[in-house]
From Swiss-Prot:
Catalyses which reaction(s): NAD(+) + NADPH = NADH + NADP(+)
Record-given protein name: Soluble pyridine nucleotide transhydrogenase
Family: Belongs to the class-I pyridine nucleotide-disulfide oxidoreductase family.
HAMAP family: SthA
Species of origin: Yersinia enterocolitica serotype O:8 / biotype 1B (strain NCTC 13174 / 8081)
Length: 466
């Protein structure tokens, strides 16, 4: 029998954006319903995206570390693992994350509904369950936090057993010797690192002229060199004409006339917002061609009581930002305005092997803006801690204003880059004279640490001034 419920707010989706909104609302006394399509909370971030891919990367990087460390490699011992082996590690992490996040909802008395959500009208949502039954939920406010999914061109047969996207790759049931990755964005580059780390041949097909063009060019070049040095074949400025599935593999026909054959294909070229099926047309909302919704600074759509957060609104499409967007939307919903906002310089972490992380401006940005900047560099191979642990590939680069010494950008390539970046970010976020590269010279760091790279880079940069 269909039931009817009323809430202060309904949150559609339980990924980072939905969780941030739901927790922000219940902490302010709201009665909240959360609708999740799948049986487990966490969204794509937990089950198909961020968490499993980073768990896979960690397992592979530890294998590489063991095999390259002189303590072990001098004994002619090596270890190896298959993709299915390291998937077990990812599954354990996913289960831990799911239990923890379910606990958040339970402790905060969010009422959960496991089904597909669609609008009946601007304040009413239908929840359709797997058994075909329905419930009707009404609320004063609604948050759309449905995330995104891999883009699937109509002319690619994703039903073929050797053609995967970044969600279905976790269901890989065979052991490929050769993989084609179509799309050299963040996801494509991360999986190129994972497969190559497992000694799988990798062809990385890039539709652009260089890898991760939004990065500082030195970081992009460093990744390209590292891939080349480890045997990844990168094909720039290429697009597919046809993707042909065969009995035992895939052939990619490129518009340039080339052909590439491998055991399987990972298609990782773009994502689209999860808005189809929501019934947006019933409330007068329309997503763009990529399935994304437009919002204002308080994450309100064209309907002031309907909010949208996370990947479904596009940039920056980061789990960390989605959670903050959800909290800000919750505050705006309850108080009528948001006292906080996303920071201007959001750090990016790219979990290739080695990692890349950046915050602030690139050298290309500052040159185009005609800002008089200087560069301070530290090579990891010169740091005692890096030498001790055997991870001496990488560098830290600090960009700062020649006259004010204000830090303008920080770029790191190497193991633990995504952690190291936050030290510099904390100083960059200081107001006025608190943001200065001299902080790193005048502060005593633990020794030996990777954080010492900031002191080395600061001294290097300041020594360039005249």
């Amino acid at each position: 029998m269909q039931q009817h419920f009323h809430f202060d707010a309904i949150v559609i989706g339980s990924g980072p954006g939905g969780e941030g909104a739901a927790m922000g609302l219940v902490k302010q006394g709201a009665r909240v319903a959360v609708i999740e399509r799948y049986n487990n909370v966490g969204g794509g971030c937990t089950h198909w995206g961020t968490i499993p891919s980073k768990a896979l990367r960690h397992a592979v990087s530890r294998i590489i570390e063991f095999n390259q460390n002189p303590l072990y490699s001098d004994n002619a011992r090596t270890i190896s693992s298959s993709f299915s082996d390291i998937l077990n590690h990812a599954d354990r992490v996913i289960n831990q994350q799911t239990r923890m996040r379910q606990g958040f909802y339970d402790r905060n008395h969010c009422q959960m509904f496991s089904g597909d959500a669609s609008f009946i009208d601007a304040n009413t949502i239908n929840v359709r369950y797997a058994d075909g039954t329905n419930d009707t939920l009404r609320a004063d406010n609604i948050v759309i936090a449905t995330g995104s999914r891999p883009y699937r061109p109509a002319n690619v047969d994703f039903t073929h057993e050797r053609i995967y996207d970044s969600d279905t790759i976790l269901q890989l049931s065979h052991e490929p010797q050769h993989v084609i990755i179509y799309g050299a964005g963040v996801i494509g580059c991360e999986y190129a690192s994972i497969f190559r780390g497992l000694s799988v041949k990798v062809d990385l097909i890039n539709t652009r002229d260089r890898l991760l063009a939004f990065l500082d060019q030195e970081m992009s070049d460093a990744l390209s060199y590292h891939f080349w040095n480890n045997g990844v074949v990168i094909r720039h400025n290429e697009e597919f004409e046809q993707i042909e599935g065969t009995v035992d593999g895939v052939i990619v026909h490129l518009k340039s006339g080339k052909k590439v054959k491998a055991d399987c294909l990972l298609y990782a070229n773009g994502r689209t917002g999860n808005t189809s099926g929501l019934g947006l047309e019933k409330i007068g909302l329309e997503a763009d061609s990529r399935g994304l919704l437009k919002v204002n600074s308080m994450y309100q759509t064209a309907l002031s009581h309907v909010y949208a957060v996370g990947d479904v609104i596009g940039y920056p499409s980061l789990a960390s930002a989605a959670y903050d967007q959800g909290r800000i939307a919750a505050q705006a919903m309850i108080k009528g305005e948001a006292n906080t906002h996303l920071i201007e310089d959001i750090p990016t972490g790219i979990y290739t092997i080695p990692e890349i992380s950046s915050v602030g401006k690139t050298e290309q940005d500052l040159t185009a803006m005609k800002v008089p900047y200087e560069v301070g560099r530290a090579q990891f191979k010169h740091l005692a801690r890096a030498q001790i642990v055997g991870m001496d590939t990488g560098s830290l680069k600090i960009l700062f204003h020649r006259e004010t010494k204000q830090i303008l950008g920080i770029h790191c390539f190497g193991e633990r880059a995504a952690e190291i970046i936050h030290i510099g970010q904390a100083i960059m976020e200081q107001k006025g004279e608190g943001n200065t590269i001299e902080y790193f010279v005048n502060t005593t760091f633990n020794y030996p640490t990777m954080a010492e790279a900031y002191r080395v880079a600061a001294l290097n940069g300041l020594n360039r001034l005249f």
